[in-house]
C-alpha cells in the first residue's frame, strides 16, 4: 500500500528541514491534535499513539542530506516506511512530500488507508511549525 501527502512548500531551507527532521523529538511538533502519546526512545526512535489507534514505534532508517529521511516501523508485525522527500526551491524555500509504503493484507489496508492518509497529510501540513 502506497500513500503520499500533498507537496507542501515551506519558508525554510532544505538543510534546515533535514536537520529538524533528523532530530526525532521534533516529530512531536508535527503530530495531529488527536495524539494520545509521544515518547522519544533514544536518538533515532520514538513511539506515538493516536486516539483509537495502536501505538506505533518508528526508527530512523536512512538519511540522505539534505533531501531525504526515511523512518520505518521498529516492529516486523506491520512493516512500513515513512519517507520525507525535501526539494530545495530556493535558498530559503523548500518543498516537502511524505510517502508511506507498507505491506498489509487487503483487509488491514482497507481499514488503515483513511487514517494513515489523514495522518501523513497532517504531518506535512504541520511542517511550517518546525
Predicted regions located by residue number:
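A short, structured loop/turn motif at beta-sheet edges
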Residues: 14, 61-66, 86-95
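Beta-strand/loop substructures that line and gate deep hydrophobic ligand-binding cavities in soluble
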Residues: 74-125
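Structured catalytic core of nucleotide-sugar glycosyltransferases
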Residues: 4-6, 58, 72, 84
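Hydrophobic ligand-binding cavity/cleft-lining segments
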Residues: 1-39, 45
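Soluble, non-transmembrane catalytic domains of enzymes that act on hydrophobic metabolites at membranes
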Residues: 2, 62-64, 79-83
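Short acidic, gly/pro-rich beta-turn/loop elements at beta-sheet edges
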Residues: 16-18, 56-58, 70, 81, ...
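Glycine-rich portal/gate segments that line the openings of hydrophobic small-molecule binding cavities
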Residues: 29, 38-77
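Amphipathic alpha-helical hairpins
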Residues: 2, 8, 30, 69, ...
Amino acid at each position: 500500500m502506497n500513500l503520499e501527502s500533498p507537496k507542501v512548500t515551506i519558508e525554510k531551507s532544505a538543510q534546515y528541514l533535514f536537520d529538524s527532521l533528523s532530530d526525532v523529538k521534533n516529530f512531536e511538533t508535527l503530530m495531529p491534535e488527536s495524539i494520545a502519546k509521544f515518547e522519544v526512545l533514544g536518538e533515532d526512535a520514538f513511539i506515538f499513539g493516536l486516539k483509537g489507534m495502536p501505538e506505533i514505534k518508528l526508527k530512523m532508517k536512512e538519511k540522505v542530506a539534505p533531501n531525504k529521511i526515511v523512518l520505518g516501523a521498529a516492529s516486523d508485525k506491520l512493516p512500513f516506511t515513512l519517507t520525507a522527500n525535501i526539494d530545495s526551491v530556493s535558498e530559503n524555500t523548500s518543498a516537502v512530500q511524505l510517502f508511506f509504503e507498507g505491506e498489509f493484507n487487503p483487509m488491514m489496508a482497507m481499514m488503515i488507508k483513511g487514517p494513515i492518509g489523514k495522518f501523513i497529510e497532517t504531518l506535512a501540513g504541520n511542517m511550517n511549525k518546525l
